[in-house]
Regions:
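Alpha-helix N-cap/helix-start and coil->helix boundary motif
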Residues: 32, 94, 115, 144, ...
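Generic beta-structure capping elements
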Residues: 90, 111, 157-159
Length: 209
């Protein structure tokens, strides 16, 4: 669930259980501008605008606003304490957020078609990769995109990154890596799958020229 739908104490408790039982954790984080402003300022289209007109859909909880970004909000409540955390989206992040994600070895799953279709923005993939984060590409769900077609996700993701990062854009080789071994590294499964190597589980997808 998005972090603004959860009591912040849930983050630390999930981390405790995940650490104890050696479980991975996946969380939607910093996906939209509305989420960013709701967490940081307590104001966005997610909140209730006035007592007489209810245009939002979430009451402002007593622990908001926090004055910090969604990444640092999650960090402050212990969301990154378990050893295998995957943050989905991470569109609205700044330099300090990226440093913290790296410090806590949090992996990133970017979902370009979902982000484009819902008007969420563009994830700073180039910054993630330069920081040495584990980055994979995901399709989100059919509720947010037209399909879960990975090849379509890769193509649109590459084109969007080329459009916003002129001169430092993502090439097809990097995108293929994100979709294969990068996607396996993100949840720490790269010793089992993600590349065609002896001892790994084969996972083939036929492609037609």
């Amino acid at each position: 669930a998005p972090i603004y739908m959860c009591h912040p104490a849930v983050f630390g408790r999930v981390s405790e259980l995940a650490t104890r039982d050696d479980l991975p954790v996946a969380m939607h984080l910093a996906g939209s501008r509305e989420e960013y402003y709701f967490v940081k300022r307590g104001s966005s289209s997610f909140s209730v605008h006035g007592e007489s007109v209810r245009r939002g859909f979430i009451e402002i909880p007593p622990w908001l606003p926090t004055g910090v970004s969604p990444v640092r909000y999650a960090l402050n409540w212990g969301a990154f304490e378990s050893p295998n955390v995957l943050a989905i989206h991470c569109v609205h992040t700044d330099e300090e957020d990226v440093k913290k994600l790296k410090e806590y070895n949090v992996a990133i799953a970017v979902c370009p078609r979902c982000n484009a279709q819902l008007g969420m923005g563009v994830a700073p993939v180039d910054e993630f990769m330069r920081a040495g984060l584990r980055v994979g590409i995901g399709t989100d769900s059919p509720a947010a995109t037209d399909s879960t077609d990975m090849l379509s996700e890769m193509r649109l993701g590459m084109l969007i990154q080329r459009a916003v990062n002129v001169g430092r854009f993502l090439d097809s080789e990097s995108m293929l890596e994100m979709a294969t071994i990068g996607g396996a590294r993100a949840p720490k499964l790269d010793d089992e799958l993600g590349s065609l190597e002896i001892g790994k589980r084969p996972d083939h997808h036929p492609a037609q020229n």
